[in-house]
């Protein structure tokens, strides 16, 4: 069995991971559909709270990332809620919204359904060695609601290792320019 690109690299912070992975995609990325891609990429951030992308070519917006995070925390899939928080609705969300102006791939809406966060907390409190503390975001029963946007994140698993909370995020797809920069901030 050959597993391509399964190198698990340790980075100091999100910006270092961004710069490294962007370079890897540009050099080693395979043509796939209308983009370049790397499959089966995994990495660890030593300091996950250092989650600002400072690469000047990217011009990442902390203000927008904070607004998107607040939108997710609200659990409201309405793009109007994001507009209320951020002051405007970014065109990408207008494009991805359904006829009710909702985005069902909204992570907050997904993880709040079925009280998944409470479930994870209870599992970890009951057994700090559990492997069942996981949140499911992508749900095959909801294919029809993903008509314009399928969640990039499949699931998030929480474990306690060395008395610290670890989080592993499994992604279906994550573009380096927009998806990675904002998703890593949320997680």
Feature names for model-found ranges:
Residues 1-187:
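Terminal, non-catalytic protein-protein interaction segments that mediate quaternary/complex assembly
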